[in-house]
Amino acid sequence: MKSEFTRAKAHATLTSGEVIRMLRELKGWTQQELSDRSGINATNISPLENERIDIGKKRAEQLAKAFDVHPAIIMFPEYEAAEMKRAA
């Protein structure tokens, strides 16, 4: 019997800014708290989350340390999505 359903395709890809916001919200932190924990100026947190400024290696490392994750998770969020797509 042929299935009536087709396999879903992955559509959601996250930007670095979306990953930063998601991690911050999962921790229950305000932007000021993230600033305090990462050492990144509070005025730069919103622009980072909204992709108005480039993250760069140094900021990615600071954020990764604050979130206790590998910097690649922040800098290359599309990599994991590509790996999952290839495995499907």
Language model features: what each stretch is:
Residues 1-10, 65, 75-88:
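Short, charged recognition helix plus adjacent turn
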Residues 18-37, 62:
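Short basic helix-loop element that most often maps to the first helix and adjoining turn
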Residues 39-55:
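Recognition helix of helix-turn-helix/homeodomain-like DNA-binding domains
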Residues 19, 44-47, 73:
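Residue-level recognition of specific faces of alpha-helices
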Residues 2-26:
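A short, Lys/Arg-rich alpha-helix, primarily the initiator
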Residues 52-57, 83-85:
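Short, solvent-exposed alpha-helical "recognition" segments
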Residues 58-73:
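DNA major-groove recognition helix of helix-turn-helix/homeodomain DNA-binding modules
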